[in-house]
Amino acid sequence: MTHALLIGNPNCGKTTLFNALTNANQRVGNWPGVTVEKKTGEFLLGEHLIEITDLPGVYSLVANAEGISQDEQIAAQSVIDLEYDCIINVIDACHLERHLYLTSQLFELGKPVVVALNMMDIAEHRGISIDTEKLESLLGCSVIPIQAHKNIGVPALQQSLLHCSQKIKPLKLSLSVAAQQILNDLENQLISKGYKNSFAYYFSRRLAEGDTLIGEKAFTESLLIKLQKTEQNLDVLLADARYQKIHEIVTLVQKKHSDASEHFTAKLDKLVLHRFLALPIFFAMMYLMFLFAINIGGAFQDFFDISTETIFVQGSGWLLQQLHAPNWVIALVANGIGKGINTTITFIPVIAAMFFFLSLLETSGYMARAAFVVDKAMRAMGLPGKSFVPMIVGFGCNVPAIMAARTLDSERDRLLTVMMSPFMSCSARLAIYAVFVAAFFPSGGHNVVFSLYLIGILMAVFTGYILRKTTLKGHASPLILELPAYHRPSLRRLLRETSLRLRFFVYRAGKLIIPICVILGGLNAITWGGGISSGEANTDSLLSIIGQWITPLFAPMGIHQDNWPATVGLLTGMLAKEVVVGTLNSLYAQVGHVGEITAAHFDFLGGIKAAFGSIPANLSELGSALWNPVSASAADSELSQSVYGIMSRRFDGAVGAYAYLLFVLLYIPCVSTMAVIRQEANKRFMWTSIVWSFVVAYATSVVFYQGAKFLEHPQQSMIWILAMSLSLLFVLAVFRYSQYGMGRQNAAANT
C-alpha cells in the first residue's frame, strides 16, 4: 500500500482533486488531540491500494504559535509526524509563482513529491501557457497537468503515484556565506541530537524561519542571535532567496499571451466589489437563492409528497388493514414510520435546490468575494470579516459552520464565530419554512423566507456585537483571503456536490425524523390512564397532555391551547430542527384525522398519477410565481382538506405563523449544535448560547406578535413588549456583570 499526503494552498482545487481521486471511498474522523476534521480516502490501481490523506490548505509550512489557526498547525505537524510514502502538491496553474513557495518548502523534507498542476484549462483561457516538461526538469519531480473538476489528467496522476519513489532534492537557494554557515551549524546540531539528515535539513530551515512549534528552538537561540548581529533576519533572507529562485523558474517555463480572462475577472470585480453596489448585489444573490429554492424546488415538492404519502402512509395502512392488524399497529406503522419517511423525502427538492445554488456560488468564485463585501461592515462593529465564511456554511448546517471557525487565527474571533453561527438558517429550518409558506404564504413565500434569513444574519451580527462589548472584548483580526478567478462550473460538478450534501442531510434527517415520528405516534396512542387509543385523535393521550401543559408559555406569541402540536414541535426541535416538520406532520394528521385509510378510499394508481401530474402543473405556474408572485396559483386553496389546512386553522393566521417561524429561527440550537459548541468552546459558552438564543427568540416572537395585534388589545400588547424589552436588558446586564466578575477573578489569580 502507498500512503500519500495531499497538500496545497487554499482555493487550489485540492478538495475537488481529493474527491476525484477517491470517489466515494472516504472516511472522516478527527486529528489526534484536536477537533479538526481529518479526511482520508483510498483507491485501487490494479491490485495496488493507494491511501490519500487530505491536509488543510496552507500557504506555508512555518508554524508560529502566535496567531496560527488549528488547520495550519495540523498541516505543518502532519508532514513531520505522519508515516507516508509521497506528497501530492496541488498547484493552481493560474498562480504558479505564488504556489511554488509551498513547493520549495516541501522539497526540503527530502520525500518523493508529485506536483499536480491544476486548473490548466483556466490558465489557458487566461492566456497562460506552461511548459510542464521544462518545469519537471527544473524541479526534479513529476509534474502532471490536470483539470480536477473535469477529471482530466487524474488517471495519469494516479499512475504516477505507483512510481513515486525518487527523493527530491531541495532547490538551490542563493544565500550569503554567513547565512549559509548559520544554517549548516544548525543542521549539524540537529544531526548530533539524533535527527536524520533529511529532517535535520528541514528542521534547520523551519527554525530559522521562526517556527515555534518544532520544539527545538531553545538550543539554537545563540546561533540565531549571532546571525542577527551580523546581518538581516534569517527568515527574511530565506524568503527572499526562495522567491528569487521561484521567479527564475517561472520565467523559464511560463508565458503570458493574453490576459483577456483576467481582464474579465477584474472588470466583473469592479461591479461585484463596488463600494456602493457590492452589498445590494450580495443581498440580491441571497434573495435569488431563496427564490430558486422555494419556487424551482417547490415545483417538485408535491410529487414527492403525494407519491410517498400514497406508498408509505396510505399504502402501508391499507395493507395492514387487509391483514386485520390492530388499530394501534396501523397508527404506529402508517402515521409513524410511513409519515416519517414521507416527511423526510418531501423536503428533498427544496433542500436540493438550495444546495445546488450554494454550490454554484461557491464554485463560481463569488462566495469568497461575499466575505470581503461584508468584511467592512462587520469590522466597523469590531467583528471579524473572516467569520462570514463559516457563517455561510451555516446555511447548510450549523455544525460544520461552528467547526469551520477553527480556521480563524485568534481565540476571540473563533469564539465570536461559534456564538454567531447558530443564528444562520440551516437547511433543516428551510424545510420548516417551506411547510409554513405553503400553508400561510402561498403568494410571495420566497419573500417571507428571505426575511427570515436576513433576520438570522442580523441577529448573528447583533450577538457578535454584544459579546464584543462584554465578554469578548478586543480587536478583530484582519481578513486575508485569496480571491479565486471566476469559474464557469460544470453541471456535473454542481450535481455531484449537491448530491453529496443532500445524501448527508437526508441520512441525518431520516434517522432522526422516523424514530421521532414512531415515538410521537406511540405517545399519542397511549392514554393518561395507560390504555391504548384507537387510530383517531386522542385529547387524553400522554403527548396531548404534555403539550397542553407547556402551551400557555407560548400564548403571548400567538400559540393557543388547541394548537399544542406546535408546542410539541418546538420541544422535539431541540433534538434536531429536521424533526419539527415530522412532528407537525404526524400530530396534525392524527388530530385532524388526516391519513385514515379505508379500503374504499385507497387508490394507489390514482395517487401516483396525481404525483406525476403535479410536476407539469406546478412548472406551468412557475412564471407567475417568479415574476408576479402576488397573483400566483390558487392551487393551494385545496390545502383545507390536508395537514396544511389543519395548521392554518390552528395558528392565528399569517401573523401567528410568522411569529412561530421567528421562534424556530432563533431559539435553542439542536443538540448536535450544542454539543459542537461545547467541543469547540466550553460548557460555559454552550449554556450562554442556549439561554441567549431562547431569550432572544421568545422576546422577538412576542414583540412581533403583540406589535402586529396591538390595535386588538393595546394594553396587553404594551405590557408584553415592555416585559420583553426589560428581559433583554437584564440578560445584557448579566453578560456585562459576568465580564467584570471574570476580570476580578483573573486579577485575584495574578496577585
Curated annotation (Swiss-Prot):
Keywords annotated in UniProt? Cell inner membrane, Cell membrane, GTP-binding, Ion transport, Iron, Iron transport, Membrane, Nucleotide-binding, Transmembrane, Transmembrane helix, Transport
Q: Where are the transmembrane segments?
A: 276-296, 341-361, 385-405, 422-442, 447-467, 512-532, 539-559, 657-677, 685-705, 715-735
Q: Where in the cell is it found?
A: Cell inner membrane
InterPro entries hit by this protein: Fe2_transport_prot-B (IPR003373), Fe2_transport_prot_B_C (IPR011640), FeoB_GTPase (IPR050860), G_FEOB_dom (IPR030389), Gate_dom (IPR011642), GTP-bd (IPR006073), P-loop_NTPase (IPR027417)
The record lists GTP 1 as bound by 8-15
Disulphide bonds annotated for this chain are none
Per UniProt, residues of the FeoB-type G domain are 1-167
Q: What is this protein called?
A: Fe(2+) transporter FeoB
